[in-house]
Amino acid sequence: MQDHKIFDIPGFVTQSGFTLNVKLAYKTFGKLAPDGGNAVVIPTFYGGRHSDTEFMIAPGRSIDTRRYFVVIPNMLGNGHSSSPSNTPAPYGRGGFPLTTLYDNVMCQHRLLTEHLA
C-alpha cells in the first residue's frame, strides 16, 4: 500500500535538457490554513524518503501538526518520485537523465503553487 501521493508534471524539461513526464511523490500532514500561512516544507535528502523525516512530525513534536501544514516532497531519483527504477524507456534504468537540485526545487515549487495552493 502506498503511503504517499503523486503529483504528475508532464513535459518537465530538466536543467540538462531532457523532457520527462515527472511523477513527484509527496506526503502531507496537518491542515492548511485558509491564508496558507502555516505551510512548512521539509525537503528530503539525496536518497532519503518522506518516511525518514516523519519522526519529528506529530502533535506535540518539534513540527506540530496541530499548528502547521507539513509537506514532504521526495527527490527525483529516490525510488518514490521519478527514478531509474520506475521510469519507462527510453529513460528507465541506465538511461535516466541527470537531475539536479534545481530540477527538484522547480518540481517542488510546482507542487506547492499548482497543486497544493
Language model segments and positions:
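N-terminal cap/lid subdomain of alpha/beta-hydrolase-fold enzymes
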Residues: 27-89
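Generic structural hydrophobic/aromatic packing signal, biased to beta-strands
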Residues: 7-9, 43, 73, 108
